[in-house]
Amino acid sequence: MIQVLLVTICLAVFPYQGSSIILESGNVNDYEVVYPRKVPALPKGAVQPKYEDAMQYEFKVNGEPVVLHLEKNKGLFSEDYSETHYSPDGREITTNPPVEDHCYYHGRIQNDADSTASISACNGLKGHFTLQGETYLIEPLKLPDSEAHAVFKYENVEKEDEAPKMCGVTQNWESYEPIKKASQSNLTPEQQRYLNAKKYVKLVMVADYIMYLKYDRNLTTVRTRMYDIVNVINVIYQRMNIHVALVGLEIWSNKDKFILRSAADVTLKLFATWRETDLLKRKSHDNAQLLTGINFNGPTAGLGYLGGICNPMYSAGIVQDHNKIHHLVAIAMAHEMGHNLGIDHDKDTCTCGAKSCVMAGTLSCEASYLFSDCSRKEHQAFLIKDMPQCILKKPLKTDVVSPPVCGNYFVEVGEDCDCGSPATCRDSCCDAATCKLRQGAQCAEGLCCDQCRFKGAGTECRAATDECDMADLCTGRSAECTDRFQRNGQPCQNNNGYCYNGKCPIMTDQCIALFGPNAAVSEDACFQFNLEGNHYGYCRKEQNTKIACEPQNVKCGRLYCIDSSPANKNPCNIYYSPGDEDKGMVLPGTKCADGKACSNGQCVDVNRAS
């Protein structure tokens, strides 16, 4: 295992406090000058690692000493991370640059539980940290032969444009009210397991041609800007139990892939279409964000599709590079990703313990890295209703770019367990110093692990949840509780359906999930709309073209429901969302006739359904 090297660096405050200076972040009115010094100094001739796995910095802020703890942002880049740019003649150039020894860190201030930090140590220290609710920035002073840095509050940066920037999302495209009103106790075991699971967003960032020109046609400068931004986004989403990993970066260095418009909604649609028809075919990812140098109409700084995550067309957002300070642009991008993850704008009653929250409709001068109570509830409601699967895909152990580090709570190649540092570990089965099982221990975690030993073969580790499920049993040879379920095709729900992959999908339940408790399945005549081959009715898509159902397959296309609420007189309701046109289709495995179930838009023999 790699031994984590802790380096203490003192930042001695220079006995001068500046009144005004022009920095990368802009014109700063009030700042402190500090000089990083390593303590203790390395012995003469010792080899200095380029970027340590963990570091500490001591310095003073407003005359008070603070200690900044930093850890390298492991998993910031995926193993298959790639970068694409274009030659002057339009030739695509894709590389897989080595990013193992990167220089991007997360951290916190000692004795401040609510503090955060996002720092680049590539050329000096650049980034932000929060201290007692205030946001501070640090960046190197560009002085010859000097290690001087400036530390200053964001509020001391002169604002170039006093007009507030806003997100362009102006309305709800979906309603999660039926879910919001449900209590946690009403969740199915499947929904509860989904909520508890850690989520991963595999992100591709794209910089347009205007960005390339804005940063002097310098690929390295644009790349560094994007790295700084994603490092902040990663910090923001940690508190939501979501890990954001950069899997790809694309820079349009010869021309834009489409004509960008100042109308943000038009540009978003064009970008989303390009992503689906081009980018997804050559780079697997969950979400794409465009960073553009164009000025959108009015105060709009960005736009994203609400609830579009995992959708080939709608898992996308666009953000204007509207501020020199990268972490403000990062907050805007995190905001648009929040929309993709099902979160709408905060209302006046929403709180996060700060002056502003990530999902505020207007980008505040008070930078915030916190999601509000409303955002958390909306995100949970979205997850319960849609259960998007792409964000459950955990990176393989070999996908972690950096060598394994014992003590980071992530079980990597060569580790049996990882319970944190020796000071924080509370796991009696795991040796925190080596991340190996203690002598005599067979396991450290898992539903079939009890007091460091495998539970006996045949021990029930998870009860059956319904008639299509089976009680899961331990094998006596593993800590894992393997999921088992009844064979596909077994009748269920009083012969109204057939078991399919452990569930009993029937149309009535699907209508209730979409329209509420008063919903029921429409008359057969409504399903004839599936013969038309448009968004009102179809059975499948081929190259984004809706294919009409054959007459025998009409019960395997769009689901038609009747809502018996007094205000609803339509006997043929469909659920349509511009963020996901396929939502509201009859689910695979649903009974479509006696002895038959839906499979790929066809009504087939129940034993052939897959």
From Swiss-Prot:
- How activity is regulated? Inhibited by EDTA and EGTA. Not inhibited by PMSF, antipain, pepstatin, and iodoacetamide.
Disulfide pattern: C310-C390, C350-C374, C352-C357, C406-C435, C417-C430, C419-C425, C429-C452, C443-C449, C448-C474, C461-C481, C468-C499, C492-C504, C511-C561, C526-C572, C539-C549, C556-C598, C592-C603
Q: Which residues form the active site?
A: E336
Please report, in chain numbering, the residue ranges of the motif D/ECD-tripeptide. Answer: 467-469
UniProt binding sites for Ca(2+): V405, N408, F410, E412, E415, D418
Listed InterPro entries: ADAM_Cys-rich (IPR006586), Disintegrin_CS (IPR018358), Disintegrin_dom (IPR001762), Disintegrin_dom_sf (IPR036436), MetalloPept_cat_dom_sf (IPR024079), Peptidase_M12B (IPR001590), Peptidase_M12B_N (IPR002870), Reprolysin_adamalysin (IPR034027)
Provide the primary localization: secreted
The residues that hold Zn(2+) are H335, H339, H345
Q: What protein am I looking at?
A: Zinc metalloproteinase-disintegrin-like halysase
Q: What residues make up the propeptide removed on maturation?
A: 21-182
| UniProt subunit comment | Monomer.
Q: What does this protein do?
A: Strongly inhibits the collagen-induced human platelet aggregation (inhibition of alpha-2/beta-1 (ITGA2/ITGB1) integrin). Hydrolyzes the Aalpha-chain of fibrinogen, without cleavage of Bbeta- and gamma-chains. Degrades type IV collagen (but not types I, II and V), fibronectin and vitronectin and also integrins alpha-1/beta-1 (ITGA1/ITGB1) and alpha-5/beta/1 (ITGA5/ITGB1) (but not alpha-V/beta-3 (ITGAV/ITGB3) and alpha-V/beta-5 (ITGAV/ITGB5) integrins).
- Upper classification of the organism: Eukaryota, Metazoa, Chordata, Craniata, Vertebrata
Keyword flag Iron-sulfur: no
Q: Which organism is the protein's source? A: Gloydius halys
Signal peptide residues are 1-20
